[in-house]
Every structure is written in C-alpha cells, then in structure tokens.
Design a protein with these regions (language model features):
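Short strand-edge motifs at loop-to-beta-strand transitions and within beta-strands
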Residues: 74-76, 107, 139-143
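Extracellular and analogous surface-interaction loops
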Residues: 101, 106-117, 143-151, 200-208, ...
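Ser/Thr/Pro/Gly-rich low-complexity linker/stalk segments immediately outside membranes or between
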Residues: 23-36
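GGW-centered surface loops in extracellular recognition modules
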Residues: 94-128, 212, 381
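Extracellular low-complexity, Gly/Ser/Thr-rich intrinsically disordered linkers
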Residues: 291-387
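Short, structured beta-strand segments at or near domain termini in extracellular proteins/domains
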Residues: 88-91, 198, 220, 374-388
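Secretome/extracellular-domain signature
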Residues: 135-258
Length: 389
C-alpha cells in the first residue's frame, strides 16, 4: 500500500512529512529527478528566488498528486506524492510591464508567456494655442485580455495636434483631423488640429485602415479636438475632449457662425452644421450644410472654411464650422474578448453599460496616469497580470 505523503519545497530544499499515528517524522529527499525546475520553459539547476521570477504552474505525472503553491513563503505543497512521481515547476523570469511611447509609427508587442494582460491606452491631445486655450485632452481606456505565449498585437500611439495661424495645422498621427487657417487673419487667429487616437489590435494598420476588420480591434482611446484662438475679438475656445463612449463637443464662442464639432460616438462620426439657426450672422457667406464630418478612425477636416480639426477615435470628432473648436473622438472597449474594462474622459457624459462603460474625470496629466485624461502625445501600456497554465 502506498503511503500518503506531503512535501514542502522551499528554495531547493525538499522535506517529506510522513503522517503516522499523528506523529511527524522528517526525511530529506535524495533522488535528484523527482522535481524539475523550468525558467521560461528552459531546464534550470536551481529554483529562482522570489524577487527573480514568478511561479505560475506545477505539473506532476501522477494525477493523484495534489499541488499548491504558497507565494508568500515561496514554497510548494504536494500531497499524496510517491517516490516514483515526477513533478515540474515552471517560472517566468522577465519584464511584466511594457510601455509604448509616441514614435509616429506602428509598434508591436509579443506576449512572453501565456496569461492575462492589462491593456491601457491614452489618446492624444488636440492642438493648443496656450495653457488657457488648449486642445481637448485624450481619453483613457483599460481592459484585460488573455494572450497566448508568442501571440503578437499591434499598437499605434496617437500624436498630438498643432495650432497654426498662417498654414495648415497637421492632424495628429493616427487620424487627427487637420485645422485650416483663415486668409487675411494670419498671426491673429489660430486653428488647432485634432489629436490622434491610440489603439491596440490583432491586425496591423492605422485605425482608419481597420474599417473592415473591426473585430481585430481590442481597445481604443480617442483624441481631443483642436482649439481656436481669436486674438482680435477675444472669442476663443478649448477643443472638445476625446474618449468615452461619446467624444465631447467643441465649444461655440462666435454665435451665428455655425457650430463647433460634435464628438464621435460608437456608431457615427462627429460633424458641424451651418443652418438657419446657427449661421444667421450678418454677412455670413457660408453655405447652409454639414461641414467637417469625421469617419471611422479619422477626425473631421473642414476643407471649405477656416476651422479647427476633430480628434480621431473609434469614430472621429467633427471639425468646426469656421471660428469654433473641434470635437473629440470616441474610445472603444466593445470587443467581447476584453474584460474588466472601462473608459475615462475629461468632464464628459457617463455610461454604465458594460461595453461602453464611461467615467468622467477632472484629472489630466502629461505623464500617462491610470484613470486620467492625457495631455500631449498619446501612450500605451501592457502589463502582465497573471500567468496562465
């Protein structure tokens, strides 16, 4: 009859505790092939210390053996072990946090080990004239996903917008809408461009290139709309914030000259409009119609009149009609593979639905900060939360 044994393994020392008549007797294991140690799937001659690696699984060839790991004491408890049983311990040694700053190009991440990873993205800010008249802040999104070892995902970090008075304001990388200057008002009126979105996907490409591959998109953070500064009249406006299930509308400061850009949503892009009610200023020559409509992955650009650009996003925000600011782009956490997910945006509308959960925040930081809107360029971070078997 086989004896029922318990074994504790602490930093390479194996101790048998044999239970008989409620008395304990310690015996040291001499067989060197009973326990194997693997670090990053390579055989090792020693167990790494707690600060060197992360334990993630133990496999025994005898199904009757019960295995558990005590991370606090850094020890393994095996029950019902026999001398013929062989158990292998597996450890991961390497980075657990992976940061992706703005580079103006696509980046990739390859999972070093199978497990649950936390995805965090920050969209980019729209073009700012000053700290007082600033472009809309980029949104923040987070969620968790299960990735397999060596599985690769694509990361695109959005670039911030510009603010110009005598030339085109180029939209931020990854879809920010352009801002266009007003002839005759050079160095007086400044129009900002939209900030770019930041996204993580399983397919390579800028966000706008994934229109027919939406299932590949894991997470998105929208960029902010461009600001507007009007020196002669002191009628200036900040851009609409990006992020959340619906990007924030820009600000109207010149009544009678159209609307600011509306924010993008989960299904439609933002735009601005000139009609009998919004374009009723004397001598307003603008045609009554919709202007500056964004699209999937692109902030709006108004090619007809001087305007501020819309922020990029799952759906981009609209560019303004003339002398107003641009709208923010929307974020996205709707992929069913994503869990524990939420979006944050600056002073925005909230949602409690799981696939569009949005929380409004008054936090905005240059440094990428959890649950905070983003100033400047976007950012992305991937963190290994737990290792799978």
């Amino acid at each position: 009859m086989k004896q029922k044994l318990s074994i504790i393994l602490i930093l390479g020392l194996v101790i048998f505790i044999i239970v008989k008549n409620n008395n304990f007797r310690k015996t040291y294991l001499e067989e060197s092939d009973t326990v194997g140690v693997y670090i990053n799937n390579e055989l090792s001659d020693k167990i790494p210390s707690k600060d060197e690696a992360t334990f993630y699984k133990a496999i025994c060839d005898d199904k009757n053996v019960s295995v558990s790991w005590d991370n606090e004491s850094w020890g393994l408890l095996l029950k019902n072990l026999t001398k013929k049983a062989k158990c292998n311990l597996y450890f991961y040694q390497g980075d657990t946090v992976f940061n992706f700053d703005y580079t103006g190009s696509e980046q990739t991440f390859t999972a070093p080990v199978s497990g649950i990873y936390k995805l965090e993205t920050w969209g980019a800010q729209g073009g700012s004239y000053s700290n007082e008249y600033y472009g809309g802040y980029g949104g923040y999104s987070k969620g968790e996903i299960n990735l397999l070892e060596k599985q690769t995902v694509n990361i695109v970090v959005g670039g911030s917008g510009e603010s110009e008075s005598s030339k085109l304001s180029q939209g931020g990388y990854n879809g920010g809408g352009n801002g266009d200057y007003q002839r005759g008002f050079e160095d007086k009126r400044f129009f900002g461009s939209g900030g770019g979105a930041t996204h993580v996907s399983t397919k390579i490409g800028l966000l706008s290139e994934l229109t027919n591959y939406k299932n590949s998109i894991l997470i998105v953070s929208g960029g902010g709309g461009g600001s507007f500064y009007d020196g002669p009249n002191s009628t200036s406006a900040c851009g609409g914030a990006g992020g959340g299930f619906k990007g924030k509308e820009g600000f109207v400061t010149n009544n009678g000259w159209g609307t600011a850009g509306y924010g993008g949503t989960q299904n439609n892009a933002g735009y601005s409009i000139c009609d009998e009610n919004t374009c009723n200023a004397t001598n307003n020559p603008l045609e009554k119609k919709i202007y500056g409509e964004g699209s999937f992955g692109l902030g709006g650009t108004n090619a007809v009149s001087a305007s501020s650009g819309g922020g990029s996003g799952f759906y981009g925000g609209g560019a303004s009609v003339h002398v107003q600011s641009g709208g923010g782009g929307s974020s996205y956490i709707g992929n069913p593979l994503l869990t524990n997910k939420v979006m944050y945006c600056y002073n925005c509308e909230e949602s409690n639905e799981e696939s569009t959960k949005t929380i409004s925040t008054t936090c905005s930081e240059e440094t990428p900060t959890e649950n905070c809107a983003k100033k400047g360029n976007g950012y992305a971070r991937i963190t290994l939360v737990s290792i799978g078997e």
